[in-house]
Amino acid sequence: MTSIQQRDAQSVLAAIDNLLPEIRDRAQATEDLRRLPDETVKALDDVGFFTLLQPQQWGGLQCDPALFFEATRRLASVCGSTGWVSSIVGVHNWHLALFDQRAQEEVWGEDPSTRISSSYAPMGAGVVVDGGYLVNGSWNWSSGCDHASWTFVGGPVIKDGRPVDFGSFLIPRSEYEIKDVWYVVGLRGTGSNTLVVKDVFVPRHRFLSYKAMNDHTAGGLATNSAPVYKMPWGTMHPTTISAPIVGMAYGAYAAHVEHQGKRVRAAFAGEKAKDDPFAKVRIAEAASDIDAAWRQLIGNVSDEYALLAAGKEIPFELRARARRDQVRATGRSIASIDRLFEASGATALSNEAPIQRFWRDAHAGRVHAANDPERAYVIFGNHEFGLPPGDTMV
């Protein structure tokens, strides 16, 4: 990343800071709409958010991924749904950069601002046919799909009735159906609807295997050689999920402190909450855990990127540590939000109280498969004992 790109990325962060008040004001409307408002997506486009991880050849900044995740953390601190969608849709520009140049040209050739959604869970498959794959399936949980013109869907490649590869198929909006099913308790504003694909031909250049990503043989590296595109999938994808959850924890913390500063505790003879020493203990504990979550999460991303920028390989030990700390960041954030919410009193149950929305959104984000702690901890433990990792998400 050049000094000019660094400066431009910092300018995007500054512009995002200026957007935060209006995004905060639209948080309830975003929930009610069940997807991001068009004006929010336009504002993110206008300040260059989606260019952060986009290749330079398409007008992007191909920036340090820590700056991208910092942006999503800030967005999530005022609206969980906005942070979630921006993180997921934003990282897809990094993913597309690894695809064959022909796929990049199909998506960005006429309009480099074209956005991509995804559903990576293997809820369908592609059968090998002449020149590519015949894809069928029904993929749930495609966050931000209403604002995308293409999508990635994950699944196996089937040949002679057997799976022979696994990865992502890139499909244009004209060839899949969006089913409006997103009626949920948390992350209501993400529009994470279901994508239905029926007998769609996907040419070979619009498939990318996870193996090619992991061993640095992805076709896109021939034209996009910046260090960010050599970051491990097992770091980028899970951090995309955890960064906004930590952001929600920061938002819940700010909402709690503001509320407690004005709260009079009716059950305790009119005592002001800010005069309660135990209230101060709770916020100190929460603040420490949230900061620790973020420092570990983003510190590992920065360590990996620094090695790549210096032309070095990322050791498996660091990748395993990054995965360990990623799930730990989610766990710490959820526990901190719970601690604060439980101490907020009955007024926190109001639909107008921001903390209840952060509480619901963070718990909804927690159920994402990338946040399963046991799987990540076993990877780390296996490595410590000199055993095979036992999982590919690392």
From Swiss-Prot:
<dbReference type="GO" id="GO:0036383">
    <property type="term" value="F:3-hydroxy-9,10-secoandrosta-1,3,5(10)-triene-9,17-dione monooxygenase activity"/>
</dbReference>
<keyword id="KW-0503">Monooxygenase</keyword>
<feature type="binding site">
    <location>
        <begin position="141"/>
        <end position="143"/>
    </location>
    <ligand>
        <name>FMN</name>
    </ligand>
</feature>
<protein>
    <recommendedName>
        <fullName>Flavin-dependent monooxygenase, oxygenase subunit HsaA</fullName>
        <ecNumber>1.14.14.12</ecNumber>
    </recommendedName>
</protein>
<keyword id="KW-0288">FMN</keyword>
<dbReference type="Pfam" id="PF08028">
    <property type="entry name" value="Acyl-CoA_dh_2"/>
</dbReference>
<comment type="similarity">
    <text>Belongs to the HpaH/HsaA monooxygenase family.</text>
</comment>
<dbReference type="GO" id="GO:0033539">
    <property type="term" value="P:fatty acid beta-oxidation using acyl-CoA dehydrogenase"/>
</dbReference>
<comment type="function">
    <text>Catalyzes the o-hydroxylation of 3-hydroxy-9,10-secoandrosta-1,3,5(10)-triene-9,17-dione (3-HSA) to 3,4-dihydroxy-9,10-secoandrosta-1,3,5(10)-triene-9,17-dione (3,4-DHSA) in the catabolism of cholesterol. Can also use 3,17-dihydroxy-9,10-seconandrost-1,3,5(10)-triene-9-one (3,17-DHSA), but it has higher specificity for 3-HSA than for 3,17-DHSA. Can use either FADH(2) or FMNH(2) as flavin cosubstrate. Also catalyzes the o-hydroxylation of a range of p-substituted phenols to generate the corresponding catechols.</text>
</comment>
<dbReference type="GO" id="GO:0005737">
    <property type="term" value="C:cytoplasm"/>
</dbReference>
<keyword id="KW-0443">Lipid metabolism</keyword>
<feature type="binding site">
    <location>
        <begin position="368"/>
        <end position="369"/>
    </location>
    <ligand>
        <name>FMN</name>
    </ligand>
</feature>
<keyword id="KW-0058">Aromatic hydrocarbons catabolism</keyword>
<dbReference type="Pfam" id="PF02771">
    <property type="entry name" value="Acyl-CoA_dh_N"/>
</dbReference>
<feature type="binding site">
    <location>
        <position position="263"/>
    </location>
    <ligand>
        <name>FMN</name>
    </ligand>
</feature>
<dbReference type="InterPro" id="IPR013786">
    <property type="entry name" value="AcylCoA_DH/ox_N"/>
</dbReference>
<comment type="subunit">
    <text>Homotetramer under anaerobic conditions. HsaAB monooxygenase consists of an oxygenase component HsaA and a reductase component HsaB.</text>
</comment>
<comment type="pathway">
    <text>Lipid metabolism; steroid biosynthesis.</text>
</comment>
<keyword id="KW-0442">Lipid degradation</keyword>
<dbReference type="GO" id="GO:0006707">
    <property type="term" value="P:cholesterol catabolic process"/>
</dbReference>
<dbReference type="GO" id="GO:0050660">
    <property type="term" value="F:flavin adenine dinucleotide binding"/>
</dbReference>
<dbReference type="GO" id="GO:0003995">
    <property type="term" value="F:acyl-CoA dehydrogenase activity"/>
</dbReference>
<feature type="binding site">
    <location>
        <position position="84"/>
    </location>
    <ligand>
        <name>FMN</name>
    </ligand>
</feature>
<dbReference type="InterPro" id="IPR050741">
    <property type="entry name" value="Acyl-CoA_dehydrogenase"/>
</dbReference>
<dbReference type="InterPro" id="IPR054617">
    <property type="entry name" value="HsaA"/>
</dbReference>
<dbReference type="GO" id="GO:0016712">
    <property type="term" value="F:oxidoreductase activity, acting on paired donors, with incorporation or reduction of molecular oxygen, reduced flavin or flavoprotein as one donor, and incorporation of one atom of oxygen"/>
</dbReference>
<dbReference type="InterPro" id="IPR037069">
    <property type="entry name" value="AcylCoA_DH/ox_N_sf"/>
</dbReference>
<dbReference type="InterPro" id="IPR013107">
    <property type="entry name" value="Acyl-CoA_DH_C"/>
</dbReference>
<dbReference type="GO" id="GO:0051701">
    <property type="term" value="P:biological process involved in interaction with host"/>
</dbReference>
<dbReference type="GO" id="GO:0006694">
    <property type="term" value="P:steroid biosynthetic process"/>
</dbReference>
<feature type="binding site">
    <location>
        <begin position="118"/>
        <end position="120"/>
    </location>
    <ligand>
        <name>FMN</name>
    </ligand>
</feature>
<keyword id="KW-0753">Steroid metabolism</keyword>
<keyword id="KW-0274">FAD</keyword>
<dbReference type="InterPro" id="IPR009100">
    <property type="entry name" value="AcylCoA_DH/oxidase_NM_dom_sf"/>
</dbReference>
<feature type="binding site">
    <location>
        <begin position="346"/>
        <end position="347"/>
    </location>
    <ligand>
        <name>FMN</name>
    </ligand>
</feature>
<dbReference type="InterPro" id="IPR046373">
    <property type="entry name" value="Acyl-CoA_Oxase/DH_mid-dom_sf"/>
</dbReference>
<keyword id="KW-0560">Oxidoreductase</keyword>
<dbReference type="InterPro" id="IPR036250">
    <property type="entry name" value="AcylCo_DH-like_C"/>
</dbReference>
<keyword id="KW-0285">Flavoprotein</keyword>
<dbReference type="GO" id="GO:0005886">
    <property type="term" value="C:plasma membrane"/>
</dbReference>
